[in-house]
Amino acid sequence: MNLRPLHDRVIVKRLDNETKTASGIVIPDNAAEKPDQGEVLAIGPGKKDDKGNNIALDVKVGDRVLFGKYAGQGVKVDGQELLVMREEDIMAVVNK
């Protein structure tokens, strides 16, 4: 991927949701909600503080994260649908 986010931005690839309920009902693609989890593919260097020093991000490449349904800006890179969002749009890191 030839994309390097700036500042406190993070590039996330959405993870696929289950398309079948626990009782075995298959949910069609057009009825399924967009997943609110993704994998961090790239991170920016971080925000700058008042003195011009970078404040490192709390997330790292490879983290599985939770974010809001409408978080981020969708972009298409090398045929992949990705999200570019600020770190503050990420609600949590999922521990594996």
Swiss-Prot record:
UniProt cross-references to InterPro entries, sorted A to Z: Chaperonin_GroES, Chaperonin_GroES_sf, Chaprnonin_Cpn10_CS, GroES-like_sf
SMART domains membership: Cpn10 (SM00883)
Keyword RNA-binding appears in the UniProt entry: no
Keyword annotations: Chaperone, Cytoplasm
One Pfam short name: Cpn10
Stretch forming the signal peptide: none
Gene3D superfamilies in alphabetical order: GroES chaperonin
Recorded GO MF terms: ATP binding; metal ion binding; protein folding chaperone; protein-folding chaperone binding; unfolded protein binding
GO-annotated biological processes: chaperone cofactor-dependent protein refolding
Subcellular localization: Cytoplasm
Entry GO terms, CC: cytoplasm
Entry superkingdom: Bacteria
Biological role stated in the UniProt entry: Together with the chaperonin GroEL, plays an essential role in assisting protein folding. The GroEL-GroES system forms a nano-cage that allows encapsulation of the non-native substrate proteins and provides a physical environment optimized to promote and accelerate protein folding. GroES binds to the apical surface of the GroEL ring, thereby capping the opening of the GroEL channel.
Assembly and oligomerization: Heptamer of 7 subunits arranged in a ring. Interacts with the chaperonin GroEL.
NCBIfam families given in the database record: PRK00364.1-2, PRK00364.1-5, PRK00364.2-2, PRK00364.2-4, PRK00364.2-5
Family from the record: Belongs to the GroES chaperonin family.
Official protein name in the record: Co-chaperonin GroES
